[in-house]
UniProtKB/Swiss-Prot annotation:
CDD domains: RlmH-like. It comes from Polaromonas sp. (strain JS666 / ATCC BAA-500). Keywords: Cytoplasm, Methyltransferase, rRNA processing, S-adenosyl-L-methionine, Transferase. One of its GO terms (cellular component) is cytoplasm. It comes from the Bacteria. This is Ribosomal RNA large subunit methyltransferase H.
Amino acid sequence: MRLTIVAVGQKVPDWAQTAYDDYAKRFPPELKVELKAVKTEPRASKTLENLLAAERARIESVITRGTRVVALDERGTAVTTVALAEKLKAWQLSGDDVAIVIGGPDGLDPAFKQSAHERLRLSDLTLPHAMVRVLLIEQLYRAWSITINHPYHRE
């Protein structure tokens, strides 16, 4: 299984990149996590609809056909760490590749969210995009650790 995080926005602060890289390197070879950052569409005189459509095209261009798409969305289904571990295990058992998509500052195109296989919410809080990358990779690592009974996660 290949797990890809697709994030709109290419530049994150050094602290966020360092934290992301630290968690990403902890995954085993059979569950490598890849980050694909796509360019944010400039706002200059574009309607929100056109801006989101342009970002959608970029997102879709880096997702391989047949990949299970999970959109992060503030109105998505809330998920606990244990529930995320169950999802991760199911994804691994299915053998499907999975792409988890983080939208840009204006979110994700509504049609893209509708076409996603799942929509998940990480938090009820509004989080900066750099923080979402770190939070997501940490929670994926924690979920993986639960699936193998690794002591990283404690209840």
